[in-house]
Amino acid sequence: MLTYGAPFNFPRWIDEHAHLLKPPVGNRQVWQDSDFIVTVVGGPNHRTDYHDDPLEEFFYQLRGNAYLNLWVDGRRERADLKEGDIFLLPPHVRHSPQRPEAGSACLVIERQRPAGMLDGFEWYCDACGHLVHRVEVQLKSIVTDLPPLFESFYASEDKRRCPHCGQVHPGRAA
């Protein structure tokens, strides 16, 4: 018996789960309890956080277009993901996926994190570019672990205030 089931038609799977690939859910994990986190992420969505993944992330833009806002060597950059593009993001490159197109779909593959290996989530000041807030978590479930972290940041003006210039990060409305 195959642990993860028989092969299946992936485009059909995406169509069958399309209702989960848009707000408010936005993503669906393909397999549970494997060594890989294989997720399909849909649009539209807009994120204000930057993810610091301790391991590589693989992106395959299946439908539509998206882009990653990046912090590289202290400056902002952008990596466009056009339909059909693949991209391997190195570990610890801060990235903020932006999926402006409804109906878009991206396959994202990550490795499960070993115990003690933490993911970071950061927010930067729009006015001066300094780090406003960082939180680290032992990531077990994207669906259950992340919303409380984000809500805690959005709900606190103190957490959103830039320690360098005093500007308040607008939170989810950025």
Swiss-Prot record:
The keyword Oxidoreductase belongs to this UniProt entry's keyword annotation: yes
Pathway in which the depicted protein is active: Cofactor biosynthesis; NAD(+) biosynthesis; quinolinate from L-kynurenine: step 3/3
InterPro entries hit by this protein: 3hydroanth_dOase (IPR010329), RmlC-like_jellyroll (IPR014710), RmlC_Cupin_sf (IPR011051)
Cofactor note: Binds 2 Fe(2+) ions per subunit.
The protein's required cofactors: Fe(2+)
Record keyword Transcription present: no
Top-level division of the source organism's lineage: Bacteria
GO terms of biological process kind: anthranilate metabolic process; L-tryptophan catabolic process; NAD biosynthetic process; quinolinate biosynthetic process
Binding site for substrate: 57, 99, 110
GO molecular function, one term: 3-hydroxyanthranilate 3,4-dioxygenase activity
Catalytic activity: 3-hydroxyanthranilate + O2 = (2Z,4Z)-2-amino-3-carboxymuconate 6-semialdehyde
Binding of Fe cation 1, residues: 51, 57, 95
Reported impact of residue 110 to A: Decreases KM for 3-hydroxyanthranilate 2-fold. Decreases activity 2000-fold
Activity regulation, free text: Inhibited by 4-chloro-3-hydroxyanthranilate. Mechanism of inactivation involves the oxidation of the catalytic active site Fe(2+) to the catalytically inactive Fe(3+) oxidation state, superoxide production, and formation of two disulfide bonds between Cys-125 and Cys-128, and Cys-162 and Cys-165. Enzyme can be reactivated under reducing conditions.
Residues noted as binding Fe cation 2 in the record, renumbered to the chain: 125, 128, 162, 165
EC number(s) on file: 1.13.11.6
Residues bound to O2: 47
Database matches in SUPFAM superfamilies: RmlC-like cupins (SSF51182)
Family: Belongs to the 3-HAO family.
HAMAP family the record matches: 3_HAO
Subunit structure: Homodimer.
Biological role: Catalyzes the oxidative ring opening of 3-hydroxyanthranilate to 2-amino-3-carboxymuconate semialdehyde, which spontaneously cyclizes to quinolinate.
Name of this protein: 3-hydroxyanthranilate 3,4-dioxygenase
Organism: Cupriavidus metallidurans (strain ATCC 43123 / DSM 2839 / NBRC 102507 / CH34) (Ralstonia metallidurans)
Gene that encodes the chain: nbaC
